[in-house]
Amino acid sequence: MKAINKIIILGMVTTLFSSCDLTLLPENAVTPENYFQNKSDLELWTNQFYTLLDEPDASAGTNADDMIDKGMGQVIEGTRSAASETGWSWSKLRHINYFLQHSSNCDDETARSQYNGVAQFFRAYFYFVKVRRYGDVPWYNQVLGSEDQELLAKARDSREFVMDRILKDFEDAATSLPTKSTDTRNTRVTKWAALAFASRAALYEGTYRKYHGLDNYEKYLEIAASTAKQFIDESGFSLYKEGTEPYRDMFCADNAKTTEVVLARVYNFEGLQLSHSVQFSIANLQMGFTRRFMNHYLMTDGTRFTDKQGYETMFYTDEVKDRDPRLQQTVLCPNYIQKGETTVTANDLTAYCGYRPIKFVGTKEHDGAAKSTSSTRICLENANELSANFRNSSSLAQIPLPRPPSA
């Protein structure tokens, strides 16, 4: 009888365990099944997207063709090639699409909508960078695996196809994101950041098409104008006007001027060892603007500097007179006094071409070390640019141009 009882008990235990799923998800690994469950999960995952924004580094934009330093650059030297490029990376897009594919696990609809907006903003930003760099690129809005060979090998989508989806992502992000940054320093994307970047992207595409003889440029210029106007009318941002040199002050302040700066990066060298090396690079790489860059600045009466008789041979101290005030707050000009100093800093002509940048330049202590903390080093978008976007896109598209508020 005891033997029978043991057999029955053993059978019951066997049946019990055979009816259970013994596959346990690892508790220390992030999987779709155990993550994206709440607002905190969504926020933590989307935090990584902010690394997509322009990284501060020692190059400080020297690869552009309006600036030169002692190291030159591939663009200026004419040595840039497909083989030397390093921007054909798609891993961050995968992280974004992975999030959008699994964020539905979160039951908090408000949080889900907000962070989906963050992901859509950064997908649009990711692709805008790619279009500017490569033109036609393949559009992916899903996570690809090794078995998706056909999609992985597909041809590039047209520039217009991708740009339309970029603008749609920015539009969707604007409807989902909050109107105020979740911190007081405007380091988080908002509805206004989405509208600002949408306007920037549309203006870029519209002018690119107009000056390259491509169709549909009017469509993008109209989007740029209407989006910028909405920002101007509704955002509450205004031009920073304090002090005698507000433009210069805005770009060398340790704390972003949040009345104007829509999206900024904040640095903290002492506590977090977060800094940038722009000022160090300007001082030690002999960075200088080109003459062509200088010629872009208009006269104070709105006429072109290059229409001025004898502009080609004009002496340095004369060519900077009566120009757009932003010139003297961007380039070292006579009577320049560095932040924290009381005496004039003379132009020692160590900068190539002689036109030394002062934008982002703070106190002298940052000249000798890569410890700059000016928050608006990454002034990713500001109200001044949106006002310019509105007027430029409206004029190019020949839209009736009301005067935007002066803020």
Language model regions located:
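C-terminal motif of bacterial Sec signal peptides marking the signal peptidase cleavage site
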Residues: 16-19
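Short, flexible, mixed-charge acidic loops at enzyme active sites
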Residues: 136-145
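Surface-exposed, extracytoplasmic segments of Gram-negative outer-membrane nutrient-acquisition systems
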Residues: 337-379
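Sec-dependent signal peptide recognition
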Residues: 3-10
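Short helix/strand-bridging catalytic loops that position acidic/His residues to coordinate divalent metals
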Residues: 147-154, 212-216
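An aromatic- and glycine-enriched ligand-binding surface/loop that stacks and positions planar moieties
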Residues: 21-72, 141, 170-172, 188-353
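Conserved, well-structured interaction surfaces
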Residues: 37-47, 51-55, 70-135, 150-164, ...
